[in-house]
Amino acid sequence: MNASQRVRVAVVFGGRSNEHAISCVSAGSILRNLDPRRFEVVAIGITPQGSWVLTDGDPAALAISDRQLPEVTSASGTELALPADPGRSGQLVSLPPGASEVLASVDVVFPVLHGPYGEDGTIQGLLELAGVPYVGAGVFASAAGMDKEFTKKLFAAEGLPIGDYAVLRPSQSTLSLQDRERLGLPVFVKPARGGSSIGVSRVSSWDELDAAVAAARDHDPKVIVEAAIAGRELECGVLEMPDGTVQASTVGEIRVAGVRGREDSFYDFATKYLDDTAELDVPAKVDDEIADAVRELAIRAFKAVDCQGLARVDFFLTETGPVLNEINTMPGFTTISMYPRMWAASGVDYPSLLATMVETALARGVGLR
């Protein structure tokens, strides 16, 4: 394939959420692994303030170095915009608007954005308006997958096994006595629309609840409180093929008990991205029957939220079987992320995995489907 036949892919990363840095790291890994013989890459960073900039796409600038997290700034490149006009065919134009110089045109967008203002249906809506195909879930599935309350409601409506939980809306300051008795201790307090374990607290005494809610509300006024589930942490990748069929990956396991010398440790932000202390088993050491059940549930969860493209589905393996925790419609793609690892263990290498995602996005197109 010559250069003129390559698919032009805009890799969009950074963004306004508190997962900005992890989005950058994921993008760096993707930029290293997109096959240059098949794809021409346009690297677009979004600053924490929301400005879009055309960058040089250097993966080294998007890595964690000495515990320092990467960030997109206005100095990272040339400021640009994507007009919400399907007649412009994926054109990226310079700013200010009066200049209107076309800096690049793209065939498909890979929105490597984690958290609100990206993974939650917002950029997906923009891309639909602009008429540009994109990798991953559509507007509805992205929004539903981002909000843990509605994810659980959709899972429950399909008869999928979930844990007990309660929701604190902005007008509610704490849990009722009835909710406390129902959930028991310990509980996990989380921003309802967040990821990467940012703002998550483990509460072992109700005296700790108010501080945990305040920590979660630093990131989201809506908070979810989940009953702790005793079990192993399993994950499974789901991938949609260009013909619309859906496949599930090898199952992986995250082992975090006792990390950093604490009995109450969990897979928090530092454990995931900074300390390198969690142990990741791919494939998970589980019976074939359990692995098959997890893969089946992962595909059912994918379909329950009307997902497209890809997802990572997280589980707890309890004494009575797997319980769904959540779905990630744009999982991490860092060098230590489980999603590409699970697919590699399934026989799909990183470049082939990315190529399938892009091909599926192009086959799906935009609009009602």
Swiss-Prot record:
**Primary localization:** cytoplasm
Q: Which is an annotated GO molecular function term of this record?
A: metal ion binding
Has UniProt tagged this entry with the keyword Metal-binding?
Answer: yes
Extract one GO BP annotation from the record.
cell wall organization
Give the co-factor note: Binds 2 magnesium or manganese ions per subunit.
Q: What is its EC number?
A: 6.3.2.4
Biological or metabolic pathway of the protein: Cell wall biogenesis; peptidoglycan biosynthesis
Which reaction is the catalytic activity of this chain? 2 D-alanine + ATP = D-alanyl-D-alanine + ADP + phosphate + H(+)
Cellular location of this protein?
A: Cytoplasm
Look up the record and report any one GO term of the cellular component aspect: cytosol
Q: Which InterPro entries match?
A: ATP-grasp, ATP_grasp_subdomain_1, D-Ala_lig_Van_CS, D_ala_D_ala, Dala_Dala_lig_C, Dala_Dala_lig_N, PreATP-grasp_dom_sf
Top-level EC class: ligase
Residues that coordinate or bind Mg(2+) 2: E326, N328
Matching Pfam families: Dala_Dala_lig_C, Dala_Dala_lig_N
UniProt-listed SUPFAM superfamilies: Glutathione synthetase ATP-binding domain-like (SSF56059), PreATP-grasp domain (SSF52440)
| Keyword annotations from UniProtKB, A to Z | ATP-binding, Cell shape, Cell wall biogenesis/degradation, Cytoplasm, Ligase, Magnesium, Manganese, Metal-binding, Nucleotide-binding, Peptidoglycan synthesis
Q: Which cofactors go with this protein?
A: Mg(2+); Mn(2+)
Binding of Mg(2+) 1, residues: D314, E326
- HAMAP family xrefs: Dala_Dala_lig
- Role: Cell wall formation.
Q: What is this protein called?
A: D-alanine--D-alanine ligase
What organism is recorded for this protein? Mycolicibacterium paratuberculosis (strain ATCC BAA-968 / K-10)
Record gene name:
ddl
